């Protein structure tokens, strides 16, 4: 997708090492819109594709082409070869005609309606087409003119996608301090995110992460007592300071549903285990305090299932023992209900030899409103039987899903897939593997290796962004 374009011409991510390419073979994926001053300056763009038509896969399926006019320094959308020839031209048109065409493009192809996007089919049909495009196409689409750029950069296109049931899930994870990568499991492409800004204390501290809406939140400590949040925005491809919680904490359980997320439990800067819960709205960037849970807990996990939020397991009580119960929060009634034995059982070896604090929080994920768990000790996958309220073993984890007491192993829902990210260390520094299973047939897990990546360490943090 616009492979030859210079990274300086727009905010971009770096696409690297899919299973079909060597890790040293890099190209550019342009998913982020340029600022107006860059697009409307006196000079040409960094790339001047003279008289060339570029088609991304999803645009080609819809019959549209992205056309670059070297004279007007702008893009337009074409619905066929005749329009492409007319837009590119033969170089004989006057400068006045070229300027008129540039203004025409800035108005979305309609000099009478500045909001029509694709004039031939109207705004509503234009949007109906655009929400079906891949997320990776939106950088190119945003480069067409101001109207397309506003649609993408404002986040409106993602809200419309969500409302109409079009969601792509990408996996974001960190295996190096302050460095994050994204992985598209469908196209099997890697994207490098900008390096996080932070203090030395935050860089070396334990961090927690969650993707909500078009944001990736990374939470940690900036000094020994101050909790901070850094927010990565998909819309700008940049990091910024996020809004602090009403009751800052760490070691909480969290999950997101569309543009909202719930953070439950955790402990404060003095180590007190909390029963607090808060809801975050990524579009408004606001925190709302929710009713308190029935039990204080830390090192717990959170999921959304059947439209309700669940906090699972963790450590609580006066003696800081492991909790086997969970709690359900109903967003309509705003009430918590305790559920016995919702936490997946620990293996016998873990129960005998390990304190609860040494083990990672429950590795749980929800696919199609079914709750799954990874048992890192027995290397098994379990499924929660809602009717009988018990856990059943359904099969094995991937062979190379190594971890240290569950730490360093990512077990996530990614749309209709379960994703497992982990791997053993080796003398050359180590590598991680990404395995996927779509639990649709009710049979045991059949894992598909999506890709592997060299890594000096295991997975520190992992989140899945669906938008």
UniProtKB/Swiss-Prot annotation:
Under the heading InterPro entries, the entry gives: F-box/Kelch-repeat, Kelch-typ_b-propeller, Kelch_1
Pfam families (alphabetical)? Kelch_1 (PF01344)
**Which cysteines does the record link by disulfide bonds?**
none
Q: Where is the composition biased (Low complexity)?
A: 92-111
| Kelch repeat boundaries on the chain | 159-210, 215-259, 261-307, 308-356, 365-411
Broad class of the protein's primary localization: nucleus
Q: Where is this region: Disordered?
A: 77-117
Q: Name one GO cellular component term.
A: nucleus
What's in the keyword line of the UniProt record? Answer: Kelch repeat, Nucleus, Repeat, Ubl conjugation pathway
Report the pathway entry: Protein modification; protein ubiquitination
Q: Where in the cell is it found?
A: Nucleus
Using the record's annotation, list all stretches that form the F-box domain: 116-163
Top-level taxon of origin = Eukaryota
What is one process in the GO biological process aspect for this record?
A: protein ubiquitination
About its domains, the entry says: The F-box is necessary for the interaction with ASK proteins.
Protein's job = Component of SCF(ASK-cullin-F-box) E3 ubiquitin ligase complexes, which may mediate the ubiquitination and subsequent proteasomal degradation of target proteins.
The record's subunit annotation is:
Part of a SCF (ASK-cullin-F-box) protein ligase complex. Interacts with SKP1A/ASK1 and SPK1B/ASK2.
Q: What is this protein called?
A: F-box/kelch-repeat protein SKIP11
Q: Which organism is it from?
A: Arabidopsis thaliana
Gene from which this protein is expressed: SKIP11
